[in-house]
């Protein structure tokens, strides 16, 4: 796995997160927390769960397990704006760390502080990305059902927008 490819995949993840939060800005407070039938969580809980997973893996991969243990609570995020602020910090931290990595780092075996499994670092990062894609699809489904679709969130849509210089960063 090349570093530039991994950074691009994380760029896509953060672009989709931004689109989801932008769409969620248009929801009434009761829509943000409305019970879901199409997914296992309401929109707020889905987004908080995704952020929680992203937050927890960075310290795990840096052998700082105790920092990744505290689980975020959905009720601490009353709206998309409060969630966005917390996500911005996570994105900064993750991007700062990703910028320190090389292709060799990505291919090197690491031991997750939580699972104690030894795998190449890139495999753990792909786990973060694929988990995000699942949660993002759930969030997009809920937003669309509420009348505020985030639009196309697939990877090729991101690439087309990026190539056209329209991808938000």
Language model region names:
Residues 7-73, 115-169:
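Short, contiguous alpha-helical
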Residues 75-143:
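Acidic/histidine-rich alpha-helical segments that form the ligand environment
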């Amino acid at each position: 796995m090349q570093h530039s490819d991994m950074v691009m995949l994380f760029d896509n993840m953060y672009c989709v997160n931004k689109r989801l939060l932008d769409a969620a800005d248009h929801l009434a407070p009761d829509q943000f927390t409305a019970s879901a039938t199409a997914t296992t969580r309401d929109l707020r809980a889905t987004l908080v769960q995704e952020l929680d997973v992203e937050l927890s893996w960075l310290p795990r991969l840096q052998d700082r397990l105790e920092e990744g243990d505290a689980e975020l609570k959905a009720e601490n995020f009353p709206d998309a704006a409060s969630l966005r602020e917390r996500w911005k910090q996570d994105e900064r931290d993750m991007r700062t760390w990703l910028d320190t990595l090389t292709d060799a780092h990505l291919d090197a075996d690491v031991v997750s502080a939580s699972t104690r499994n030894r795998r190449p670092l890139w495999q753990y990062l792909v786990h973060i990305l694929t988990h995000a894609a699942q949660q993002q699809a759930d969030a997009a489904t809920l937003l669309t059902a509420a009348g505020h679709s985030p639009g196309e969130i697939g990877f090729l849509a991101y690439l087309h927008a990026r190539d056209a210089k329209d991808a938000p960063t």
